[in-house]
Amino acid sequence: MNQNIQQQIDELRVTLRHHEYLYHVMDAPEIPDAEYDRLMNKLKALEAEHPELITPDSPTQRVGALPLTAFEQVRHEIPMLSLDNAFDETTYLAFDKRLRERLKNNEEITFCCELKLDGLAVSLLYENGRLVQAATRGDGTTGENITENVRTIKAIPLRLYGDNIPARIEIRGEVFMTEKGFEHLNEEARRTGGKVFANPRNAAAGSLRQLDPRITAKRPLTFFCYGVGVLEGGELPTSHYARLQQFKKWGLPVSDAIKLCTGTKAVLDFYHHVAEIRPNLGFDIDGVVIKVDDIALQEELGFVSRAPRWAIAYKFQAQEQMTVIKDVEFQVGRTGAITPVARLDPVQVAGVIVSNATLHNADEIERLGLRIGDTVVIRRAGDVIPQVVSVIEEKRPENAQEIVFPTQCPICQSDIERIEGEAVARCTGGLICAAQRKEALKHFVSRRAMDVDGMGDKIIDQLVEKEYVKTPADLFRLDEKILSGLERMGEKSAKKLLNALEKAKSTTFARFIYALGIREVGEATANGLTAHFVSLEALREANIEALKAVPDVGDIVAKHVVNFFQEEHNKNVIDQLVNDIGITWPAPVVATHEAGDNPFAGKTVVLTGSLSQLTRDEAKDRLVALGAKVSGSVSKKTDMVIAGEAAGSKLAKANELGITVIDEDEMIRLLDQSK
């Protein structure tokens, strides 16, 4: 055997274990992920060339072995007992009193307080520092051998790190999944048609009990240790807290949220603090575990049949409960999103009476297989809106009703659109829908739209709440009496606002289209549409294929435009604005400049960076006036990029694509030249 190869492999293993320790235990990585991957790939390559040098504890051996047909049973040498529970302060205080009476000690006891993780309890057996067996808790006496699966979890060291490691030690802890990992796993499952889990605990348990370790290897599992079982050929500190710190030094992850608390007040303060930070932890817990810290006192207190006397789990109120769906209603959000909401038999969840739960969208109803009358599990975590996570199908009544998603808005009866590839269905009646009214009107009068000077958000709020205005056309029918009666509006302000409304009737075609609030139609798209179609009638009659001929208009935008102009309510409001109110815009002027005089005519231009001589809006207006289309992104269709100070990725992309780039001074010169 080449001694140099063995040395390289050993050094790489030591280095990789060191960085795994820093990443998973200390949460203080020294190198970027790419460098870790490079070292790992180098080790894999050397081991592939010299398979006789592969050892079970090598960092490369986490990828997952071949599938099993069944899990072997493992008998725990020391039973993995459960904990007694406290669900209120009185029960916890009784526990503390019981301990002091048993110990014949009136002094306050010091406890090690930890998070009660909501995952799957596991046992890890290390011999001479190497992981040789992993098992589930099972019934406390017998569990399942999950060694190959656990070896794939990067947070669990295959070999302990440091000095004074016992010859044989069993570490106990919890395998769990973070909220972020859980969300990513379910997103991927929905995308690929895989199994969607109800909560992180189910996801962790299902991932850990896979017969195929290669599947487990792809799941975002992690681990915290909290105790010890078998101990042979070594010594540990006589404090539980100190033991956890020792485990951390050996490379085993330990939660940072552990604390020594002396006396009941300190313990209760810790409990309430954890309850407060619980929503921001990033993983699920269901309480606090309170353990006598002194190991000698633990041994003196001993055990009852199923639990230690020296520990208790002080549980939080449940985040999941069962209830029955009585009905489903459909709500309309301020942007027109249609959200199904389940009406429930009221039930207490996490300290709050819950009678409604979001169902998100039609896809979620289909995924759950949900019907009215079903018994369901609902979940409420932190400030998150309660949601239905699963259906208990065996409790489904014979008269359960199918949930039918509406085709018309329940508020304004406009058509509901759902574009292929989008989960959310939306009301198309943006100009008349009461649910969307405030936001639609605020957009309509905004500076880049109809530019009604003085018509602020608070005025719109009052006009809608007092039912003076329902559609954009109603704004132009307001009189001095109505306006002067609004909060903080006198006669002078009312006259000024009426003048601003009158002035706004003379606008541009692009501003008018932008003001309508068609989904996905921003300023740049409005400019492109109006430059291409020239007249309102032509744009209203355009089909999807005709719309897609406009630069930067694809399938989705084209469908939104067609759906908007096909909706009868929208047609009526547009007709009122143009025919009754008299909103007008100049007829398009055909440019007479030769190309040499006007380098912007018909060109797609992108502005990037900070401008010093003009505001971005002023520059955009002058460019559009000369026939340019101002886009927000650089692509192969871009003709010119105008780069101000601190121009970033757009400038880099323009250079990469070979697009003409000019600075602000050159833009000003060309604008002035083209007047």
UniProtKB/Swiss-Prot annotation:
Q: Which UniProt keywords apply?
A: DNA damage, DNA repair, DNA replication, Ligase, Magnesium, Manganese, Metal-binding, NAD, Zinc
Necessary cofactors? Mg(2+); Mn(2+)
CDD domains per record: BRCT_DNA_ligase_like, LIGANc
Q: Which InterPro entries match?
A: BRCT_dom (IPR001357), BRCT_dom_sf (IPR036420), DisA/LigA_HHH (IPR041663), DNA_ligase (IPR001679), DNA_ligase_AS (IPR018239), DNA_ligase_CS (IPR033136), DNAligase_adenylation (IPR013839), DNAligase_N (IPR013840)
PROSITE patterns assigned to the protein according to its UniProt record, in alphabetical order: BRCT, DNA_LIGASE_N1, DNA_LIGASE_N2
The active site annotation covers 116
The entry marks the following residues as binding Zn(2+), namely 409, 412, 427, 433
Task: Give the protein family.
Answer: Belongs to the NAD-dependent DNA ligase family. LigA subfamily.
Q: Could you tell me what this protein does?
A: DNA ligase that catalyzes the formation of phosphodiester linkages between 5'-phosphoryl and 3'-hydroxyl groups in double-stranded DNA using NAD as a coenzyme and as the energy source for the reaction. It is essential for DNA replication and repair of damaged DNA.
**Protein name in the entry:** DNA ligase
| UniProt source species | Proteus mirabilis (strain HI4320)
